[in-house]
Amino acid sequence: MAIRIKLKPGREKSLERRHPWVFSNAIHNIKGKPEAGETVDVVAHDGHWLGRGAWSPESQIQVRIWTFDREEEIDRAFFARRLQRAQIGRNDLIREQGLTGYRLVAAESDGLPGITIDRYANVLVCQLLSTGADLWRDTLVELLAEQYPDCAIYERSDVDSRKKEGLLPVTGLLHGTLPEMPVIIEENGIKIAVDVIKGHKTGFYLDQRDNRAIAARFVKDKSVLNCFCYTGTFGLYAAKAGAASIENVDVSSLALATARLNMQVNGLSDDNVHYNEADVFKLLRQYRDEGKTFDVIVLDPPKFADNKAQLNGACRGYKDINMIALQLLNPGGVLLTFSCSGLMPADLFQKIVADAALDAKREIQFIERLSQASDHPIGSAFPEGFYLKGLVARAW
């Protein structure tokens, strides 16, 4: 008989709307003794069935729902169906843009909570962030090896969120032979070097693909400051689009070395590109004090808020950095600014940038609102999947 999780009265509403998380404070009692990652059934207080998911005893999110179909068993066939559906959902995008790098599985938004899979040419990189994902690792690897026989499979489950599940970090080769790093992917006709072993996240920020192309529309014959540049891909797009000068800024010398490589693999001269290993906050203040200005500035910082307690501090950080960036823009210049925190509402982010403009004594116009690329879908019942917010603002 299935292990059963009964909810407290009134706590079934989010599951009836198909939100895939059950928090610990919503649970009334547990019938049975589930092991970490084991499949459990969730029922309302009156006993009616709600969903079937994975048990995470050490997490605040104690059940992550695999399915809302009572007839659907959680077995090898279930994961095969989910993986096939995820690939079908990307096929149009791959054909249209000629992609060799894309997000294959976007966790909850693809009905596979805790599972992220990115494809970089013939390397699949898995990030397993929950006990349920961890339990089904071997099955996932078998299925991926069958569906993608030419691909190596590498794991990058080395993120802090695993600690909340009581899991240790895991990295390493799961299947096949890993090619020499970096691997080269292509998007929008541009080649990009990706190191799946040492790179951020699974190796690269695939979610900014569309925004890199949008940024390129504003840069011809312009001076571009690319902040938190990582491997320099906003700058790479700018170089191809005819920017007059580009400054790529990051604290990582390894990232900047890859930024140089990206120019080389695309056959682009970097005579007009400056690579600056520096702290962005300090550098922007320095440039303001020196009276230095730019035509286009890209702000793509790391996440400022990992939890709600950090949100107020994140708001101050976003306001400060956007204020200084706006002070560095020439009249008519363009700021592309981003927040990758799922806790930051899009409207609040826009208000922060508007307030930053007031403090900077600049008049701005919001000319585009940006989000993550379409291979990072947002489930209709999972608003948390909308994490990347961006704005394009023109300053006068």
Curated annotation (Swiss-Prot):
Q: Which reaction does it catalyse?
A: cytidine(1962) in 23S rRNA + S-adenosyl-L-methionine = 5-methylcytidine(1962) in 23S rRNA + S-adenosyl-L-homocysteine + H(+)
Q: Name one GO molecular function term.
A: RNA binding
The protein's matches in InterPro entries, at most eight in alphabetical order, are given as: PUA, PUA-like_sf, PUA_sf, RLMI, RlmI-like_PUA, SAM-dep_methyl-trfase, SAM-dependent_MTases_sf
Pfam families membership: Methyltrans_SAM, PUA_3
Q: What is its main location?
A: cytoplasm
Question: What family classification does the UniProt entry report for this protein?
Answer: Belongs to the methyltransferase superfamily. RlmI family.
Spell out the protein name for this chain: Ribosomal RNA large subunit methyltransferase I
Q: Which gene encodes it?
A: rlmI
